Amino acid sequence: MIKLRMPAGGERYIDGKSVYKLYLMIKQHMNGKYDVIKYNWCMRVSDAAYQKRRDKYFFQKLSEKYKLKELALIFISNLVANQDAWIGDISDADALVFYREYIGRLKQIKFKFEEDIRNIYYFSKKVEVSAFKEIFEYNPKVQSSYIFKLLQSNIISFETFILLDSFLNIIDKHDEQTDNLVWNNYSIKLKAYRKILNIDSQKAKNVFIETVKSCKY
């Protein structure tokens, strides 16, 4: 249902400078300033620029411990959560626990998606919307939407939001209706994350329909 688009040769080790380039690419990608897919996971960085970095120690240590695929997942998992995450923070134990939780979430994506859909459905009953579709629609009066608030509150995951977007077009519809700064910051990250995911939108839609049906009975 969902699969990451990763750099080629993921089972190899890379040097410290290459780890820095990978980190920089993903960080700029998540901030909407670069496109790792368009440029095929390539970026030019001079040796001089890398040597000037006071934090190159962290990149070197990571290069000795993790393969390319693992590094990409570590950076993606942490930069999805925080676009401005510093390499020193990403290198600590908490960040690595976060990475392992992210891997677990991806492996159980169907279960997590169904769980989030049920939470959305029960939330819709709690707030007493006149129609279930209102949960996914932008409300100009409050400059937000229920589905966005659920994402902000960590009730649903970024993966669930993007799976829903694959057949409901939530992100683009919100973009058309608002230039709200808070939404814009999330929109940049969501669209960047969406680019590095291969999604089976029909399967996501089928799971959504079946899960909502099961909640009604």
Swiss-Prot record:
<dbReference type="GO" id="GO:0006260">
    <property type="term" value="P:DNA replication"/>
</dbReference>
<dbReference type="InterPro" id="IPR023197">
    <property type="entry name" value="Phage_T4_Gp59_dom_sf"/>
</dbReference>
<keyword id="KW-0238">DNA-binding</keyword>
<dbReference type="Pfam" id="PF08993">
    <property type="entry name" value="T4_Gp59_N"/>
</dbReference>
<dbReference type="InterPro" id="IPR015085">
    <property type="entry name" value="Phage_T4_Gp59_N"/>
</dbReference>
<protein>
    <recommendedName>
        <fullName>DNA helicase assembly protein</fullName>
    </recommendedName>
</protein>
<comment type="function">
    <text>DNA helicase loader protein that participates in viral DNA replication, recombination, and repair. At the fork, required for loading of the replicative helicase onto DNA protected by the ssDNA-binding protein. Coordinates simultaneous synthesis of leading- and lagging-strands.</text>
</comment>
<dbReference type="InterPro" id="IPR008944">
    <property type="entry name" value="Phage_T4_Gp59"/>
</dbReference>
<dbReference type="GO" id="GO:0039686">
    <property type="term" value="P:bidirectional double-stranded viral DNA replication"/>
</dbReference>
<dbReference type="Pfam" id="PF08994">
    <property type="entry name" value="T4_Gp59_C"/>
</dbReference>
<keyword id="KW-0235">DNA replication</keyword>
<dbReference type="InterPro" id="IPR015086">
    <property type="entry name" value="Phage_T4_Gp59_C"/>
</dbReference>
<comment type="similarity">
    <text>Belongs to the Tequatrovirus DNA helicase assembly protein family.</text>
</comment>
<comment type="subunit">
    <text>Monomer. Homohexamer; when associated with DNA. Interacts (via C-terminus) with the DnaB-like replicative helicase (via C-terminus); this interaction brings about the rapid assembly of the helicase onto ssDNA. Interacts (via C-terminus) with the single-stranded DNA-binding protein; a ternary complex between the helicase assembly protein, the single-stranded DNA-binding protein and ssDNA is an obligatory intermediate in the helicase loading mechanism. Interacts with the viral DNA polymerase. Binds to single and double-stranded DNA.</text>
</comment>
<keyword id="KW-1194">Viral DNA replication</keyword>
<dbReference type="GO" id="GO:0003677">
    <property type="term" value="F:DNA binding"/>
</dbReference>
<dbReference type="InterPro" id="IPR037082">
    <property type="entry name" value="Phage_T4_Gp59_C_sf"/>
</dbReference>
